């Protein structure tokens, strides 16, 4: 697309970053100054009743800056990148029609990628094929299925861990249904985002600072009643660790503690480690992201001013 045709598109802002980097605080500050409306881009914040462990904006913050796409699913329900793209595009169109600018804030990089580049035309899930894969896994083990994936799609196999049955079964399912590999199909993007996007990433300047923030926030969550929150989910009886909601960092470790698999101290240690690993993956995504403007979360006023400098011209 030419620069001239891009300039005629409606404007949007992406505010991305690893967990515990101060994205929400900056987004709320920007809403006070710019004509923006916030859309959450977070695969954990979509779930109702999962507030403390996801660091969901509190009532006061939401009053100051309402976020769209929060609390839109029960923890028992799935929500895909395709679901997000559909919902986000609808919200963006609504915001643009009102003469304001969508500000998309969060850390689920797959959602940002799906929104920006479109989605590949992957086949829908087939219960019969999935059942056949699970039967084979029960008989031969997931390691065997991972070797099978290596033979047909070595690129996907290198990316998917043998202990990740959900992604492993999906990669094989796609191949069995379509005759094409997941790698082949995902190289064909769908429709690009029909917006002129200003992209920002916020993170502390050093990894040590981010690690400190993550540890502090995890302990803060525990002090705020995180265990009671997960106990309420645990007591429902219909939730389990195969669900994306319960696999969220922190929740999975607390769940293991409630099931008696690990001690409280192990839960805290593993929860912090899992959150650090998530942050590392998010930063890896962002380092390979084209056209992103980096902000230092340790200098919030400077970060705010840099955003205003880049996008200030679109606020009028």
Curated annotation (Swiss-Prot):
Substrate binds at residues 19-24. Its EC number is 2.5.1.75. PANTHER family: TRNA DIMETHYLALLYLTRANSFERASE (PTHR11088:SF60). The record marks 108, 130 as: Interaction with substrate tRNA. Catalyzes the transfer of a dimethylallyl group onto the adenine at position 37 in tRNAs that read codons beginning with uridine, leading to the formation of N6-(dimethylallyl)adenosine (i(6)A). HAMAP family: IPP_trans. It comes from Shigella dysenteriae serotype 1 (strain Sd197). This is tRNA dimethylallyltransferase. It comes from the Bacteria. The keyword Transferase applies.
């Amino acid at each position: 697309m030419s620069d001239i045709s891009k300039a005629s598109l409606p404007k949007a802002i992406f505010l991305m970053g690893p967990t515990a980097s101060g994205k929400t605080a900056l987004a709320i500050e920007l809403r006070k100054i710019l004509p923006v409306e916030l859309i959450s881009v977070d695969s954990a914040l979509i779930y109702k009743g999962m507030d403390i462990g996801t660091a969901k904006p509190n009532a006061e913050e939401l009053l100051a800056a309402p976020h769209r796409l929060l609390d839109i699913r029960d923890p028992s329900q799935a929500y895909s990148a395709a679901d997000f793209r559909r919902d986000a595009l609808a919200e963006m169109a609504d915001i643009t029609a009102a003469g304001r600018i969508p500000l998309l804030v969060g850390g689920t990089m797959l959602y940002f990628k799906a929104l920006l580049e479109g989605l590949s035309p992957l086949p829908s899930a087939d219960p019969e094929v999935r059942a056949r894969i699970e039967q084979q896994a029960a008989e031969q083990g997931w390691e065997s299925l991972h070797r099978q994936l290596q033979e047909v799609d070595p690129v996907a196999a290198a990316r998917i861990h043998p202990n990740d049955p959900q992604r492993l079964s999906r990669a094989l399912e796609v191949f069995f249904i379509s005759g094409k590999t997941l790698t082949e199909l995902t190289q064909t993007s769908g429709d690009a985002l029909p917006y002129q996007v200003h992209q920002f990433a916020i993170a502390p300047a050093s990894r040590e600072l981010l690690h400190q923030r993550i540890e502090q926030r995890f302990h803060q969550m525990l002090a705020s009643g995180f265990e009671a929150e997960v106990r309420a989910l645990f007591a429902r009886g219909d939730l389990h660790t195969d669900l994306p909601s319960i696999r969220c960092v922190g929740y999975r470790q607390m769940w293991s503690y409630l099931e008696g698999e690990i001690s409280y101290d192990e839960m805290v240690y593993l929860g912090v480690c899992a959150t650090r690993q998530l942050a590392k993956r998010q930063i890896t995504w962002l380092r390979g992201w084209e056209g992103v403007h980096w902000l230092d979360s340790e200098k919030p006023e400077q970060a705010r001013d840099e955003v205003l400098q880049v996008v200030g011209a679109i606020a009028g």
